[in-house]
From Swiss-Prot:
Free-text comment on this protein's domains from its UniProt entry: The N-terminal domain has binding sites for ComK and probably for unfolded/aggregated proteins; the C-terminal domain interacts with ClpC.
InterPro entries referenced in this protein's UniProt entry, alphabetically: MecA_C_sf, Neg-reg_MecA
Pfam family name, one: MecA
Lineage, uppermost ranks: Bacteria, Bacillati, Bacillota, Bacilli, Bacillales
Protein name stated in the entry: Adapter protein MecA
Known function: Enables the recognition and targeting of unfolded and aggregated proteins to the ClpC protease or to other proteins involved in proteolysis. Acts negatively in the development of competence by binding ComK and recruiting it to the ClpCP protease. When overexpressed, inhibits sporulation. Also involved in Spx degradation by ClpC.
Keywords recorded for this protein, A-Z: Competence, Sporulation
Highest taxon listed in the record's lineage: Bacteria
UniProt similarity note: Belongs to the MecA family.
Gene: mecA
GO molecular function: protein-macromolecule adaptor activity
Subunit structure: Homodimer.
Length: 217
């Protein structure tokens, strides 16, 4: 990882995806798993403090650029005076692109990921220890208009489920989720990771199709 001290309040990192993986992180989970994203960020900031005595205190302005070979991250520390925060932010030559890439790394995703996503909708990826567990679920869960897709990833099966708030209230969603988790387990995997690295087995209404093709033992 390269660390460049821009000025007294700003520091720039460049970390390759290989370096991220060598540190024990997955290049996708840092965006979609808040806890892991925070862990990587604080690890980088601790290294910056050790090398350049850049202390992590006060409000931070974080700018992230996802490049072909890694991430470029610019961190500017705000100066608090009389209750007011002053930020001396370096001006990028590509102002428009910079504005679009201003993200809060702690949220675990970029601002671009929010476009077109209804944040009120509950979605989850459920993992299964055995394929038979999914078959059993399909024969005991009969809400066929619930959006769900089946994926295979790293030797296991996963069901992505999307709840429509227009169809089901919060209590109904919780009840359905509880039923499904009797046969599987909740994961922190994202649908984006499933789509990119996994294999789609059934693209829509997976449980309904499984029930029709596989008899229950």
């Amino acid at each position: 990882m390269d660390i460049e001290r821009v000025n007294d309040t700003t520091i720039k990192f460049f970390i390759t995806y290989k370096d991220i993986e060598d540190r024990g992180f997955d290049r996708d989970e840092i965006w979609y798993n808040r806890e892991r994203g925070e862990e990587l960020f604080f690890e980088m900031m601790n290294e910056a403090n050790d090398r350049d005595e850049f202390e992590l205190d006060g409000p931070l302005w974080i700018q992230v650029h996802a490049l072909d070979k890694g991430l470029e991250i610019v961190v500017t520390r705000g100066q608090v005076s009389d209750g007011n925060v002053k930020l001396e932010i370096p001006v990028s030559q590509d102002k428009e692109n910079t504005d679009e890439n201003i993200v809060d790394l702690m949220t675990g995703h970029s601002s671009e990921d929010d476009e077109g996503i209804d944040t009120d909708q509950l979605e989850i990826v459920i993992g299964f220890n055995d394929f038979e567990d999914i078959i059993s679920l399909s024969h005991n869960f009969f809400i066929d208009d619930l959006e769900n897709e089946l994926y295979h990833f790293e030797g296991r099966y996963y069901l992505h489920v999307l709840f429509n708030d227009d169809q089901y209230n919060e209590d109904e969603q919780d009840d359905m989720l509880s039923q499904m988790l009797e046969y599987g387990y909740e994961t922190d995997l994202s649908i984006h990771r499933m789509q990119e690295y996994g294999k789609e087995i059934i693209g829509e209404y997976a449980l309904k199709h499984l029930r029709g093709h596989f008899p229950q033992n």
